[in-house]
């Protein structure tokens, strides 16, 4: 029986790898500290183009690893002229990817004014600027809505976007991801596709999406989309990230 179980486990592992493709990068958040070879911080409280209310910091008060999860913690406190603090981590300058299956297992906060996100920006943002660099929002959730939203942003003689929400109880752990190749970007929730964006042959000026992108994880407070927190919003509140993984899709190449 034990031998059978070992063989079965090996078969399941092989099948999973065949389905996902080759794992090219991951952070399982099993170390005691946040990896400096995987993540850097955006720091400050300039609104980030969205009228956000928080000041992002690199303090352990706002981001840390605990019990195998990355915790991004939004707090209500006076800090550098702002009334809230949180964290925004990114792989910019360390890890960039073109194409692949990119996913994270996460549980995010629900509350008026809360705006957790798992997303990507083009590596060339410093020179091309937004939206010409491209943006892939793998997962966004706002306030008390019972859905997650996947969106792509790019430049086509001005900012354009395409996306779709899908029902989701974000207060529970789910796997959010995209499958991205030269033809399309497919948004996935727990392995099920709910939206697809066509980028084949740079259709509709989507050439941005054939360039390297970096990953971002953040928990914003307030902003033009979710609105401000109110008396019902509970602080501190936490975004939990179990892992982030990047696979090479079968039959396609993922460049770093």
Give the location of each predicted region.
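Sec/Tat signal peptide C-region and signal peptidase I cleavage site
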Residues: 14-18
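GH16 jelly-roll
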Residues: 19-256
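Sec-dependent N-terminal signal peptides
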Residues: 4-13
